[in-house]
Amino acid sequence: MNPYFLNDATPWTELGDGIRRKIVGHTPELMSVLVQFDQGAIGTPHAHDAHDQIAMVISGSFACDVGGVKRVLRAGDAFVAPRLTPHGVVALEAGSTLLDQFSPRREDYL
């Protein structure tokens, strides 16, 4: 396994609807993923059965809803969504980017 992530050498994977991601790195217990959104793109509300998630805003801003609590988050802010907690986002600016951390790793992303 390569222990380094080189952003410029890693292409985005287009997910559709104005959302793209890059896998930064992973172990069986942890995964880091950059997720970039076009303005107005929606991270549809959902919950994870088997994963805890921390999402940190790297750039831009998001309207977030975690467990029914709504906030606008900007670069440097984050939210925690323990497993089974509904959460979703709407990008308020073009290029808004999250660094998602999952535990354990998301096998469905590999």
Provide a role label for each language-model segment:
Residues 69-83:
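Short acidic-glycine-tyrosine-enriched beta hairpin
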Residues 33-48:
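Conserved short histidine dyad/triad with adjacent acidic residue
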Residues 50-62, 67:
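Glycine- and acidic-residue-biased ligand/ion/polar-headgroup-sensing regions
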Residues 61-63, 70, 86, 95:
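Structural motif
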Residues 1-31:
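A short, N-terminal "cap"/entry segment at the start of jelly-roll beta-barrel domains
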Residues 83-108:
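Ligand-binding loop in jelly-roll beta-barrel domains
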